[in-house]
Every structure is written in C-alpha cells, then in structure tokens.
C-alpha cells in the first residue's frame, strides 16, 4: 500500500512540475515536427559536403547560421571536400571561384576565405546537396554534372557553375528532372 501511495504522490509531483513549466514556457505538443527534422537533415548534409566537423566546427541549423558563416569566412580546407563532391579538381574549383589556382594553393588549410568566395562555396555546396538529393547518389550526380544536357545546349552543367545565374539555371533543370520532365 505504501508503494502505491508513493507512486500516486510521484505522479502528482510530475504533473505539478509539468504545469509549472508549461505556464512559464509553453511546450509544443510535438518535440520534433517533421519540418524541423527535415531542415536539420538539410543543414547537416550541407555541413558534410563542406567537410564535416573537421572543417566546420559550428553546427548549421538555419539560414542565419549560413549568413554568419559567410561573413566570418570558411577554411580553405572545405574546398577539397566540395571539389570531391562535385568530381572536380582544385584547378577547376579555383576557376569556379574566379581565383587563380596559385592564389588558392598559397593559402594555409586553416586560412579563411573572403566573404565573396565563402558565399560562392556555400552556394555551390547547396547546389551539390540539391543535385545529390534529386539524382539519387553522389556518384550519379557527379556523372550527370559532367555530361552534356540538351537543355543547356549540349553542354555539361559544370560549365554553368561559375555564376549565380548559371547555378540557378542548373537548379531549375534539376527541378524539372525531379518532376519527370525531360531536359
């Protein structure tokens, strides 16, 4: 009987604690709604494309983090991971960043890129993330990226990644592919 009384008191105490917490800080009924889980996966996969925890110490949980990261700069070492995800050499990567290969090569691995280069790298990483998502795998995406596409005048999508407008054009083509429209 004492054990049952103890359990009842414990249950009442739990309810009292929950009520006190809910008055001050209302807790949502669902701890992790699907939209938040999807966003977390999106930003974590972006971090993986950029080299994971080895190159990005801070976590990415939203657009504000991307803005702050752009302003702060990212390490040169993120370029290797991104180049690998795109299936390109560092020489090609430097061309996409409108910088000479030698200038990129001179930087230390931990040296931060300037704001414009960082923004371009993040844009390319988001593009790679979207491409892998639509095409289905990293390897298939790399093959697609280097293959001539009719909608691009029989040029590979890689040829258009040196400008923001080109990236947006290729993202539109990915959207068409996702919808099943031949491009």
Protein language model features and the residues they cover:
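Non-transmembrane "mature" sequence context
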Residues: 2-183
């Amino acid at each position: 009987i004492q054990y049952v009384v103890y359990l009842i008191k414990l249950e009442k105490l739990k309810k009292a604690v929950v009520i006190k917490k809910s008055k001050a800080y209302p807790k949502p009924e669902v701890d992790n709604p699907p939209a938040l889980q999807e966003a977390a996966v999106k930003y974590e996969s972006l971090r993986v494309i950029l080299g994971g925890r080895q190159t990005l110490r801070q976590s990415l949980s939203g657009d504000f983090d991307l803005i702050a990261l752009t302003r702060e700069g990212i390490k040169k070492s993120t370029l290797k991971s991104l180049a690998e995800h795109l299936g390109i050499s560092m020489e090609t990567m430097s061309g996409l960043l409108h910088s000479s290969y030698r200038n990129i090569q001179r930087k230390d691995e931990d040296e931060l890129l300037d704001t414009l280069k960082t923004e371009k790298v993040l844009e390319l990483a988001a593009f790679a993330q979207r491409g892998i998502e639509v095409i289905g795998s990293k390897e298939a995406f790399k093959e697609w990226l280097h293959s001539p596409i009719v909608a691009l005048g029989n040029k590979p999508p890689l040829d258009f990644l040196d400008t923001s407008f080109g990236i947006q054009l290729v993202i539109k083509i990915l959207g068409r592919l996702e919808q099943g429209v031949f491009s």
